[in-house]
């Protein structure tokens, strides 16, 4: 029987976008790459990761046996607004129950960004769960 962990998080990111030449953030470097098990990629590294998903490197978002978490980036069209981006992270991780690892990953992500607000919840079907928000004054996740 498979164990599933369900994750939903959102990060509101502040930033200055003063002109068109300002570079876009590299979200894969800041948050992690997505890994999709249905990709037809025959790249040796990807094949190796698929076999050893529990050892998924830090360049990827947390991974279960059928893929990683996903991310969606919303860019605020109002360039005069300090609230520049909203990042959604979400997914269902099969054969994954390490909520501490998810919490550490989210903390690492938030510490790299200028976070206005951030919250995450993760629920493992084995009965463990956490919900936390980013406390910018303490620069850490604070649980409920």
Q: What does each model-found stretch correspond to?
A:
Residues 1-36:
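Short, extreme N-terminal segment that most often corresponds to the first beta-strand
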Residues 24-26, 30-144:
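Charged interaction segments
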